[in-house]
Amino acid sequence: MRVGIVGAGRMGRLHARTLLELPDPPDLVVHDVDPDGAHRLAQELAAGTKAQVTVERELADTVTKADAIVVATPATQRRAPLLAAARAGLPVFCEKPLTADETEAAELVEALAHTRLHVGFQRRCDPEYQRLRELIAAGELGRVLLVRCTAFDHRPPADAYEETAGDIFTDCLIHDIDAVHWLTGQPTVAVQADGARLLAGSGYDVATAVLTLADGARAVLSASRLDPHGYDHRVEVLGTKGSLSVGLDARTPLRLLGQDGTGCPPGPGAQPAYQDFTDRFEAAYRREVLAFVRTVTEGAPSPCTGQEALRAQRVAAAAGRAARTGTRVELDPAPHGAPAALVAGAAR
């Protein structure tokens, strides 16, 4: 098998390395709008692997030579490779969101409807999140009343990052929005949100959102671009029979204040705090790439379809609008794609 890696940045490197660590690694074809960056990554990947790693300057040649495509470019550059993969009928793994624009994302979902599409919401492949979902589905918590998500990054991104990745809702909290939908099985029907610029960045660096789910339950999401102690991402679910938490362990960058006034870590045997998302979700990233390989080689179902990803993106975009306008935004819970005319235009 030969996999095209479109995007030679951090996520392209991460997914390519994971593919090469497989017992029978596929050959890789690397493409980036920066040819020098593509060559640097290919040289780095080729060291110590039996797989062949080559570079293609043209996107069309990359698609022609590949059996599957991994799209890991900035969000504003995903349209072209996704449409090329759609025309070729290739299985596609794409980082979230599908693109920075909500309407364009709907067009892409329609264009990719006949392909095997896996969108990279890695929490769906995290063992702890998967176990939490199993327990919720089994009724261990009873009826879900409230979901609370914490999403604190260790360090703020560069100002230019938001120009290609989207705001804190579309870039960061979209993961938690998708997790809420996936864990509870309930879509969002309304959202209220707020954000503030308290640091030196150009966009919101702290934000909150309250989701109203179709069954009446609520989800409260909190995000920050800065946590001086490390990377802190957690979820808590409260139901009529009990509650469960994921992400609270000896590496969580949080200290509990005891009655004696001293702080202690949340778990026994304190360890260095998580530093970033690749640290916290290392296992999830490996498992999602393995899931994509099974989608390609065995026809296994995608852990996250285009329609599911689009639903999360629509809620994230609505949260951004709610924060900017100070209003509650109502949403249609049913997934739907773009008008056929838009899709036809996008595919040309």
Swiss-Prot record:
Q: Which cysteines are joined by disulfide bonds?
A: none
- Transmembrane region positions? none
Enzyme kind, highest EC tier: oxidoreductase
Recorded hits in InterPro entries, A to Z, give:
Gfo/Idh/MocA-like_OxRdtase_N, GFO_IDH_MocA-like_dom, NAD(P)-bd_dom_sf
Supply the Pfam families for this chain. GFO_IDH_MocA, GFO_IDH_MocA_C3
The protein depicted here goes by the name Streptomycin biosynthesis protein StrI
What taxonomic ancestry is recorded? Bacteria, Bacillati, Actinomycetota, Actinomycetes, Kitasatosporales
Asked if the record carries the keyword Glycoprotein, the reply is no
